[in-house]
Amino acid sequence: DVLGSVRDRSLAIEGQDYIIVDSLDSETEWGQALECCDVVVHLAGRAHMLNDEAADPLEAFRRTNTIGTLNLAEQAANSGVSRFIFLSSIGVNGAATSGMPFNVYDSPSPHSPYAVSKLEAEIGLRAIAKRTSLDVVIIRPPAIYGKNAPGNFGLIEKFIRIGIPLPVGSINNKRSLVAIENVVSFIAVCIEH
């Protein structure tokens, strides 16, 4: 069985069981959702804030992406959840490399408040895993594309749709992309193995 959590009833998938969670922070109580739960797949977070109005963006990202994530993981560990799958970000690695793709051995070099908050969550999750029986899986996907993609990919898609020319011919920059379907398949593998 799968139980989802959404901020708003309109975001729920028809026919899917879910609970409404107003916020993701240190105060969020996950007890009901974690009853009889074996695996948590944590995809929620604060992201894609193109015109961020927060007085302190890093603190706003930390409240949700770091503290909210660690609160959920602590409650999951205390509830007997066996695995916690966390969708982090390739931004933890940095903004760019010198001609080589990022790899698992690269030192983290987050380039934005969002990426800093994700790295801090990763560090906290590893600490929770060390002192509990919770198995933690951290996924750092590159830009994810698919129907109604948010963030930079959604913005590029919008520019193309309305006819704004993109200067891609003059850019010497390589970026990795992954289809949402492939991310979902990988998460399914992480759940089963």
For the regions a language model picked out, list residue spans one by one:
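NAD(P)H-binding glycine-rich loop region in Rossmannoid oxidoreductase-like domains
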Residues: 21-66, 71, 75-79, 92-95
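Glycine-rich NAD(P)-binding loop of the Rossmann-fold in SDR/ketoreductase-type enzymes
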Residues: 60-71, 108, 112, 116-117, ...
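Conserved Rossmann-fold NAD(P)-dependent oxidoreductase catalytic core, especially the SDR/UDP-sugar
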Residues: 70-113, 129, 137
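Glycine/proline-rich active-site loop of Rossmann-fold NAD(P)-dependent oxidoreductases
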Residues: 119, 145-155, 190-193
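Conserved beta-loop-beta element that borders a ligand/cofactor-binding pocket
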Residues: 123-147
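Alpha-helical substrate-binding/gating segment
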Residues: 157-165, 174-193
